[in-house]
Amino acid sequence: MANLRKTHPLLKIANDALVDLPTPTSISAWWNFGSLLGLCLVAQIITGLFLAMHYTADITTAFSSVAHICRDVNYGWLIRNLHANGASFFFICVYLHIGRGLYYGSYLYKETWNIGVILLLLVMMTAFVGYVLPWGQMSFWGATVITNLLSAVPYVGNMLVEWIWGGFSVDNATLTRFFAFHFLFPFLIAAFTIIHLLFLHETGSTNPVGLNSDADKIPFHPYFSYKDLLGFAILLIALISLSLFAPNLLGDPDNFTPANPLVTPPHIKPEWYFLFAYAILRSIPNKLGGVLALLASILILMLVPILHTSKQRSLTFRPFTQLLFWLLVADVIILTWIGGLPVEHPYVVIGQIASFLYFFLFLFLIPLSGWLENKALKWSCIDSSASERRSCKPDVGG
């Protein structure tokens, strides 16, 4: 009798995705972040569900209900700290996952990559509406500033903002709908994650050398399932350590003050994981231009597969593009630093230079370096009969 996991309609799906999945032997720890993101999502949904049982989405009691969770609910302080810091770890894993995709050419699986960019936008929206819920000063003013950006949309901008607010300012209606969105979006993210995996398993994973690995694959379980479990352990140890020893390290002190529409905080800034995009937004003195730059800073990822000029998939054997990749990483770190600083000289100029470099690297320098490396290698690639395979040989006497 055939094994049940291979014949049962439901178990067969799980088996093909988690047990008998053919996996390249050479994939490194950089391929762990997909499963770590799955762990983060599950942890966020579970902790969020328990928080939602005690939270009240009303401006008069929201702040008090969060205090009540931390003071009176059994282990409420731990659940709240795990949820708040879990968001930070979620974004750390997201950015490392995207970085790995850029470095190793995973973006050439266009459907998987584009679904991933949609997932990034959904995760960012979820984190933004979630940050508003404690109804502290930074929650209120962050919501006011960011939603106000939509007023830059021509003709319908003001109407759009009032529609999102549910009135003429950020008020009770805004908080209620943001709570509804924050509860809904994680399940939408879970659905898109399944689609993301569906497209990934159509092609299989890439590998560090960027070559076709059909001839050298092993089952996902037990080899990579145990490797993923090690990643789970490291992530959970780091998350629990941060939540227990320095739970407010990544938060904003202003959020310990209840929201007051009459007092503006001296520096309005989002959570650390949005600072790079916030710096790009602030670097353009025009409101509409800033909003477009903010959107472009994320949506530019969708252009990466189109702008791929190299005959090699991965950056493993492309030293010049490697240099530009790490320059991009440094640039994003600089943007994150600038996003948390006040709008004054010299930070404004540094932010503008870093923002220009961010787009210049994606749109011009990295595609140019791929083209130059092709010229340097003098490769002529001949398409084989299989469309996804390419046999490459150096030009002789060229």
From Swiss-Prot:
GO molecular-function terms, A-Z: metal ion binding; ubiquinol-cytochrome-c reductase activity
SUPFAM superfamilies: a domain/subunit of cytochrome bc1 complex (Ubiquinol-cytochrome c reductase), Transmembrane di-heme cytochromes
Cofactor note (record): Binds 2 heme b groups non-covalently.
The organism's place on the tree of life at top rank: Eukaryota
Membrane topology: Multi-pass membrane protein
Keywords, in A-Z order: Electron transport, Heme, Iron, Membrane, Metal-binding, Mitochondrion, Mitochondrion inner membrane, Respiratory chain, Transmembrane, Transmembrane helix, Transport, Ubiquinone
Binding sites annotated in the UniProt record for heme b b562: 83, 182
One GO cellular component term: mitochondrial inner membrane
Listed PROSITE patterns: CYTB_CTER, CYTB_NTER
Transmembrane stretches, start-end: 33-53, 77-98, 113-133, 178-198, 226-246, 288-308, 320-340, 347-367
Note: Heme 1 (or BL or b562) is low-potential and absorbs at about 562 nm, and heme 2 (or BH or b566) is high-potential and absorbs at about 566 nm.
Similarity annotation: Belongs to the cytochrome b family.
Protein name as it appears in the record: Cytochrome b
Native species: Channa asiatica (Small snakehead)
Classification lineage: Eukaryota, Metazoa, Chordata, Craniata, Vertebrata
